[in-house]
Amino acid sequence: MIASLRLGLALALLPLPAVAQRSDALAVERAALTMRPGAHRWADDPTLPGPVSIVVSVPMQMAFVYRGDVLIGATTVSTGKPGKTTPIGEYAILQKRPFHRSNLYNNAPMPFMQRLTWDGVAMHAGNLPGFPASHGCIRIPTAFARALFAATALGGQVAVVNDVIAFPAYRPADPVPRLEAEVAMLAGRDDRVSSGGRRGEPR
């Protein structure tokens, strides 16, 4: 009897970490729904499995941070203003510097800089007016930038999307890679190369 009670108790306790993780993720999601410019929420648990990845929603002016598939942080952002828009796409963190100055824009300070491209796009601490205002970078609050800088690794995945993320507590699926071919490089009806490698006769 005692043994069966102990077994039942042990089984009941097994899912608690997963329940707690999902509960924390939902709390971050709820906070994100009412954030004002400059607001953020960080609830990382370094014991969670999986790498840290980031999804930036340009229309929402929000970023969501995941460890594995669990939402651990959300923040307001300021992306690129008209004419200097932040490019949509999948990126890897190429460089990290706790303090950096822009070599493109008047030596502007870029604390907790995490570079996404070699031509001027990065995540860093900066001013958040509530609308796209940067020269292409993704500005985030200083406290959030510090925590994010400590959590990420070189090569970490960052997705900049032009979508509204309805349920950020559940990490969006990675986009299916799109294969594109250069039409001029494809074999066409005017190709005259035979299987033997010699120019064939026209049909």
What are these regions (language model features)?
Residues I2-M113, W118-I138, T142-R203:
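N-terminal pre-domains immediately preceding structured catalytic cores
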